[in-house]
Regions:
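Short, solvent-exposed loop/turn segments that connect beta-strands within catalytic domains
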Residues: 90-94
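C-terminal, non-catalytic macromolecule-binding modules
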Residues: 96-125
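A structural signal for alpha-helix termini and helix-coil/disorder junctions
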Residues: 20-23, 60, 123, 155
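Short amphipathic alpha-helices in soluble, non-transmembrane regions
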Residues: 6-22, 112-121
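Extended beta-strand/beta-hairpin segments
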Residues: 19, 26, 49-50
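An extended, acidic, His-containing surface patch that forms the Zn2+-binding/catalytic region
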Residues: 2-13, 33-81, 86-89, 107-112, ...
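Extended acidic/polar, glycine-enriched regions
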Residues: 25-29, 39
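Beta-strand secondary-structure signal
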Residues: 1, 35, 97-101
Length: 178
């Protein structure tokens, strides 16, 4: 919430900010819009000082691709996603829940980026917890399963298959652990 005394200053600042964002992403995000309106005080809110620290922590939190594969050109190796920020309430009161996910073809790199995220969010959050996610899985170009699959493709289509690796949450790492 912004005090009414600052409403016009905020409107001018926000309109300038919107114009900047539109100039940066307008060709890609054609439906982007931001809107400022006067409303009643919400039931759930974050005190101003806590909100400032939360915004700083979110700004410091890594998001996106953090490393490319050194063995497979063009393949993202490690990434992190700042997925959602939600206001919630329980018996203790209002709190903010932040969900992130990390992926990597190298398990140790996944844990490293998870620690970076935790360090950034710990600046503002009373508690930071992690789910397990998918284990790291490095593509294996010499995999026996890949050879069987390539041969089956060649037999069916009389053509060499195009084999690529992708960066995604894959069950392959789960299968590999078994």
């Amino acid at each position: 919430a912004i005090p009414m005394a600052y409403k016009e200053d905020i409107r001018v600042m926000l309109n300038h900010y919107i114009a900047t964002i539109e100039a940066e992403i307008g060709d890609v995000e054609k439906d982007f819009f931001m809107h400022l309106e006067t409303t009643d005080m919400p039931e759930l809110f974050i005190p101003a000082e806590k909100a400032k620290v939360l915004i700083q922590a979110l700004y410091a939190c890594p998001h996106g691709m953090t490393a490319m594969s050194k063995t497979m050109p063009g393949l993202v190796e490690t990434s992190t996603n700042l997925a959602s920020v939600k206001m919630k309430e329980d018996e203790k009161g209002a709190f903010v829940e932040i969900n992130t996910s990390q992926r990597s073809s190298i398990e140790s790199k996944k844990h490293d980026i998870k620690q970076m995220v935790e360090c950034a969010l710990a600046l503002a959050c009373d508690e930071v917890t992690h789910g397990d996610g998918y284990p790291g899985w490095a593509p294996n170009p010499q995999s026996p399963l890949l050879e069987v699959t390539k041969k089956a493709y060649q037999d069916l289509f009389a053509a060499e298959p195009k084999v690529l690796a992708i960066h995604a949450g894959l069950e392959c790492g789960l299968f590999l652990e078994k």
